[in-house]
Structure formats: structure tokens, C-alpha cells
């Protein structure tokens, strides 16, 4: 039996966030949950949970579509679906009640991600305004890191002698000791020399690529104990300096996807077995299908093109020197 007075959406949202935190859900997931609930409250008002019906949710998702992309609306849809499942467990709504019942997810059109080809990587790095910005670009291109992963790195995570760098993958909760390529090694050594010149003796707990602080009019210094808050701004500015005009949707994923696709093409061209799975591991994706979409390719098509382009489809026929003679009765 349902209580006579169920909580308002704002109160339920706070209670839900505490529960999700106790269950070990990532901060990013919980932020998405709360964003979806704020959208719902703005649309419907701070009504009681059991007053949410099909029409209210339909209108809320429609309003989200006015300012959000189809994929973002679908993400909010999924977040709200999880919230109302929790509401059923809490008996805030009936066990058989689902205000999202019958509301379809939006179709998301395929969008080609713009990528930087490998031969342009040096030019992009040179376009960085400062050594600090250059190091952020290098982490995206050569380590395929997400923003949260790149800005969280500390000096203690880097071991140039063993050629490894430890990365916390917040999306999965894993800690991966990743290999440092020769390209990344060069950038790290260059950056660490500059870092030491600017900040003095380096401390293991300092951020690998820290925030900056104002020390005068349009003058800045490194702030080793502070984390960069908006790494995407660094990427946007560097891309603009590199010659890209539209950088609105660009961020670390532009670098991550570019580096990953370039490496896959390199491995695939050299017929390395399991090229896609190798790149999948480096991207920390849960499935090959996710990696295929991220790289903008279908491996079977790539193999087909490589095997057939400019080559004979039936080489066995060309190898035969015998010309068949058709006999007539």
C-alpha cells in the first residue's frame, strides 16, 4: 500500500542520490541522474512523485529535446527510468506503475566524428599555446585519455624508466598501468623539464599537468596542487590555432578518437591480428561494437577494402593457363 503523501521530486532526488552513492555508482553517473531530474522539475514543477504521469513525462522529454540533442534526451530518459524503478522499490509509486511506459527513445542519426590524421599530429602539438597545453594535447593523441583521466594524473603515476603511466579509469573504476609510446615519452620528458624550470623540484603528489594561477596582469604561473577544471577549453583553443573554425562540440574526445583511429589504421595496414581488440583495450571500452562506432568503421568492410582494392577477386582463375574449349555437337 502506498503512503498517503509521497515526497516531492526534489526531496526524492536527494534521497535517490544518497542511495546511488551508497551503491557505488560513479560521480558522473549520479551527475547525469540529477541533471535529468532537474530537467523534469523545471518542466513539471516540484510535484509529488506519485503525481508524475505519462503526460507529464512526455512533455518533459519533449522540452528536453528543444535544448538537448537526441542522444542527450535518451540519456535523460534512461536516467529517469532508473529513478522510477527505485521509486517503485521505495513504494512511492505502485509496483505496476511506470510513467515512462510507451514513450519511445529518440532516433539518433549517425554523425561522422571529425578526426585529425596521424600526419597532422606534430602540427597540432606545435599549435599549442604553451608547454602545458601541448602536454594535454599529447595525452589525448598518444594515450587516448578522457578529460577526467588526463587531469587526474599525478607525477607519481609516471615511470619513464619502466615506460609506464598509471591511469585511473573513472568510468569503470579500474586502474591501468599503461605503456608509454616513444612519441609520448618524448613529450613527457620535454614537459617535465619545463615543469621543473617553472616550479622547482617536482613532488610526486603534484598534478602531472596542473592548473594555472594569476600572478599579475595577464601573467600566469603553474599551480601544481590544483587540477585543471576545463581541459576542453585547451583543446578548443589549440584546434582553433591549428585552423579549425567550428570547435564548439570538440574536446578531449576529438583527440582520443583521432589517436585511436590512427593507431587502428596503422595496426590494420600491417595486418596485426586483433587490431580492433588491441585498440579497444587501450580505449577501455566494454565491447568491440562500442569501439567500432567510436572509430567510425566496420571492420569487415575495412578488411574487404584492403583485400580487394586493386586486387583480383579470383586469382585462381588468373593462375590457370588453360583456355577451355566449348565443343558443339
Language-model-derived ranges and their functions:
Residues 115, 169, 283-308:
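Catalytic-site neighborhood detector that most strongly recognizes the C-terminal catalytic loop/helix
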Amino acid at each position: 500500500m502506498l503512503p498517503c503523501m509521497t515526497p516531492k521530486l526534489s526531496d526524492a532526488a536527494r534521497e535517490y542520490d544518497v542511495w546511488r552513492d551508497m551503491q557505488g555508482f560513479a560521480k558522473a553517473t549520479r551527475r547525469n541522474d540529477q541533471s535529468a531530474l532537474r530537467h523534469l522539475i523545471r518542466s513539471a514543477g516540484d510535484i509529488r512523485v506519485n503525481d508524475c504521469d505519462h503526460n507529464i513525462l512526455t512533455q518533459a522529454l519533449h522540452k528536453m529535446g528543444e535544448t538537448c540533442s537526441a542522444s542527450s534526451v535518451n540519456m535523460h530518459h534512461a536516467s529517469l527510468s532508473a529513478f522510477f524503478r527505485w521509486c517503485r522499490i521505495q513504494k512511492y509509486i505502485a509496483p505496476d506503475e511506470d510513467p515512462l511506459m510507451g514513450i519511445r527513445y529518440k532516433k539518433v542519426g549517425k554523425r561522422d566524428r571529425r578526426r585529425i590524421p596521424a600526419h597532422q599530429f606534430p602540427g597540432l602539438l606545435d599549435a599549442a599555446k604553451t608547454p602545458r597545453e601541448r602536454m594535454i594535447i599529447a595525452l589525448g593523441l598518444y594515450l587516448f585519455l578522457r578529460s577526467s583521466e588526463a587531469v587526474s594524473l599525478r607525477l607519481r603515476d609516471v615511470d619513464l624508466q619502466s615506460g609506464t603511466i598509471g591511469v585511473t579509469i573513472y568510468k569503470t573504476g579500474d586502474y591501468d598501468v599503461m605503456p608509454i609510446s616513444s612519441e609520448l615519452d618524448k613529450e613527457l620528458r620535454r614537459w617535465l623539464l619545463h615543469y621543473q624550470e617553472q616550479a622547482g623540484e617536482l613532488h610526486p603528489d603534484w598534478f602531472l599537468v596542473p592548473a594555472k594561477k594569476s600572478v599579475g596582469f595577464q601573467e600566469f604561473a603553474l599551480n601544481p596542487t590544483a587540477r585543471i577544471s576545463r581541459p576542453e577549453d585547451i583543446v578548443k583553443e589549440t584546434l582553433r590555432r591549428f585552423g579549425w573554425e567550428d570547435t564548439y562540440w570538440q574536446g578531449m574526445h576529438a583527440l582520443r578518437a583521432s589517436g585511436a583511429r590512427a593507431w587502428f589504421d596503422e595496426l590494420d595496414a600491417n595486418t596485426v591480428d586483433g587490431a580492433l581488440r588491441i585498440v579497444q583495450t587501450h580505449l577501455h571500452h566494454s565491447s568491440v561494437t562500442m569501439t567500432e562506432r567510436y572509430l567510425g568503421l566496420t571492420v569487415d568492410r575495412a578488411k574487404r577494402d584492403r583485400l580487394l582494392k586493386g586486387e583480383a577477386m579470383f586469382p585462381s582463375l588468373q593462375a590457370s593457363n588453360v583456355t577451355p574449349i566449348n565443343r558443339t555437337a
